[in-house]
């Protein structure tokens, strides 16, 4: 089992809105630093672009198409030397609904 110095929490964040993601990252890093834990990040990961091709016409005209895309922005934050106060503060943190959070200990 890892000792307290070797423990780390890895937080992966995903969102469609980059600004919402960045504000969430800032809040997590600020909370970790306030509880005397070392926060590394946010580390930006490659943005995933998903492109959808749709026919404009409901019937014929296959030549007329329209493209839509969704961009998924991702970040990683590593928190080293977390204490019980750090974990409690992160659990109480209120983050926006548009951000998907995955936590690994």
UniProtKB/Swiss-Prot annotation:
Give GO cellular component annotations, separated by semicolons. Answer: ribonucleoprotein complex; ribosome
Q: Which InterPro entries match?
A: Ribosomal_uS10, Ribosomal_uS10_CS, Ribosomal_uS10_dom, Ribosomal_uS10_dom_sf
Q: Which GO terms describe its molecular function?
A: structural constituent of ribosome; tRNA binding
Q: Tell me any Pfam family this protein matches.
A: Ribosomal_S10
> What are the record keywords, sorted?
Ribonucleoprotein, Ribosomal protein
SUPFAM superfamilies found in the cross-reference section: Ribosomal protein S10 (SSF54999)
Lineage: superkingdom: Bacteria
GO-annotated biological processes: translation
Q: How does it assemble?
A: Part of the 30S ribosomal subunit.
Query: What role does it play?
Result: Involved in the binding of tRNA to the ribosomes.
Question: What NCBIfam families is this protein classified in?
Answer: PRK00596.1, rpsJ_bact
- Give the family from UniProt: Belongs to the universal ribosomal protein uS10 family.
**What is the protein name given in its UniProt record?**
Small ribosomal subunit protein uS10
Q: Give the taxonomic lineage as stored in the record.
A: Bacteria, Bacillati, Cyanobacteriota, Cyanophyceae, Synechococcales
Q: Which gene encodes it?
A: rpsJ
